[in-house]
Amino acid sequence: GSIVGGGLKDLRIASIKAVDEAGVSGYRLSGIPSNLDDQEFSRIINEITPKLEEEKLRYLPAALSFDQMIGAVLAGVDLIDSNLAAKKAANGIALVNQGATVLHLDRQHFNFDSQVLDRQCACATCRAGYSRALLHSLITNHSFYGEQLLLQHNLFTLNKLMGGLRQAIKNHQTKKFVQELLQNQ
C-alpha cells in the first residue's frame, strides 16, 4: 500500500495505519516531494521507516540524489527505483569513486584528458578504453552515443555501490562502509 502525506507527519502516520489495516504485503513510500533537499528527505524517510512493519517490503519509487539513495537504504528501504544514473548521463555527468564523486564531462578541461572515466571500474565503457576526452567530445556535440556510454557506466557504478552496501549490511560493516564512501567524496 502507498504511504502518502509528503512532509506532513500526521498524514503519513494516518496513511501507515490505513495501509497496515488493509493487510498488504509491502509499503510504497510515495508522496515525498521531489524537490526536497537531502536533509529534509532524510528527516521524512527516518520518520517513516521506524513505524513500518519490518517483515514487509519497503519500496521507494524515487530517490533523486546519491545521498538520498544511501540514506534510504540505511533507513531500511529495501527497493529503490531511481533515475539518478540516467539524469546524470543526460547532463554529461559521470559517477566515479562508487558514485561519491562526479565528473562534469562537458567542461573544457576534459578536452585532452586521455584517462578512462574510472581506472577502478570494470564497466563496458571503461573496459573498452573510452577516454574522458572522447566522451567530452561526444557530450559537447550532443551525441546520443555519449549519453548511452555514460548511462552504461553510471548504472554499473550505482549497482556496484548498492552491492557493496548490501554486503556491508550483511557483514555488520555498514558504518565503516559509509565512512569510507564519504571520505572519497
Q: What residue ranges belong to the model's regions?
A:
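Glycine-rich phosphate/ribose-binding loops and adjacent secondary-structure elements
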Residues: 1-118
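C-terminal extensions of enzymes
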Residues: 118-185
